[in-house]
Amino acid sequence: MGKENAVSGNSIPIHGRPVTRALASALRASSKLITSSEVAATTQNQGRVLRAKSKRTALDEKKANAPKKRAVLKDITNVTCENSYTSCFSVAVENIKQIKKGRQSSSSSKVASSSATSQVTDAKVEVVSNSAGASLSVFTDTSLGTNETSYSIIAKPSSRSPPRPFGTVERSCGGASSPKFVDIDSDDKDPLLCSLYAPDIYYNLRVAELKRRPFPDFMEKTQRDVTETMRGILVDWLVEVSEEYTLVPDTLYLTVYLIDWFLHGNYVERQRLQLLGITCMLIASKYEEIHAPRIEEFCFITDNTYTRDQVLEMESQVLKHFSFQIYTPTSKTFLRRFLRAAQVSFPNQSLEMEFLANYLTELTLMDYPFLKFLPSIIAASAVFLAKWTLNQSSHPWNPTLEHYTTYKASDLKASVHALQDLQLNTKGCSLNSIRMKYRQDKFKSVAVFSSGELPDKLFIS
């Protein structure tokens, strides 16, 4: 009894239970008496094993409950070209992110240039950032043997000051000699304008427009059966379709972008070009419209040339090519913002200028060479030319437009001249859907307006 009491007095839990008298007797009978240190070591090791197992079990349960990852199918046609073009803008995006996070040194009083140049095949992007928080992205396309250059100046939005009455004049910079501009975001009464977040929203849109832009020479490099003329005929027909079904303008702009981006990376036969057009309009309608037209309606407008199954199959191919990320800022996206900035120079809202700017911007959808310009540049150029068309007695550009577009007049010279050629139809284009549309009285018949000669002094900053 004394020995048993001695053992039981130093009882140590084994496998989660204490060493009782009965257990001690059983261990002694089987000659498997263990010491306290051995039991402690055994218990510690078992505890580690149990903890490891419990972690692994929890991890397995977590994995079991998590949804399974599915491989995204992607069309790999011309994937080298796509990856090259994506990497072409990677430098711009990274520099913009650094600007937004405020990584530049605030002690620098001069322009601190952190420039990065990335050259892929025939294209080059150069990003120059300065201490004021502005970023200039320069896209040079030398593939066509020209020195065409697109500029994208992205200014970091400053923190919003307390609300002021609409029309309050601010200074764009801290210097006394800086030009003044009107704060169009000071009107906080209309919640749809998102005045508080508008600078950040359009800053992000300016970053997004640099991504997934089709090369302006994909017709020559990717397509062998589809031509520039066929693309123009398709867009001209889609303008009529959008009018027939009273679709919003954003649907048309997004449709044309989807067509160009798909043609940029995939070879398409001419017999399937119209199928691609109605499919892209179907996808854009689902994204932009409240009540999108049904597939059968799109088949009907092609005189039942294509079946429902063919449209669904093409829709699947397009969505896979885009990895289901179909949205991009278009010229219409920026035109709304720039028109609001342009209207402050008028005592009353000018509907003629609004319709004329929309007309000029839509004309660029049919013109394949305009792919070399950024959407924001096209929108700014449309406002510039619209103001010049309506009033040639004053300069069409002012500090307010320069502030909100981030473009100087000198940056728009090439695009404005190209847009004026479209307006005057110097090439004698026979596609008239957009011109007939804007000759209607509801659009103030702005298609009949013509602009005078553009003197070089307009583009001197």
UniProtKB/Swiss-Prot annotation:
One Pfam family recorded for the sequence: Cyclin_N
Record GO biological process: cell division; mitotic cell cycle phase transition; regulation of G2/M transition of mitotic cell cycle; stomatal complex development
Cellular component, GO annotation: nucleus
An example molecular function term from Gene Ontology annotations: cyclin-dependent protein serine/threonine kinase regulator activity
Domain of life: Eukaryota
UniProt KW keywords: Cell cycle, Cell division, Cyclin
Family: Belongs to the cyclin family. Cyclin AB subfamily.
The protein's name in its UniProt record: Cyclin-A2-4
Source species of the chain: Arabidopsis thaliana
Gene designation: CYCA2-4
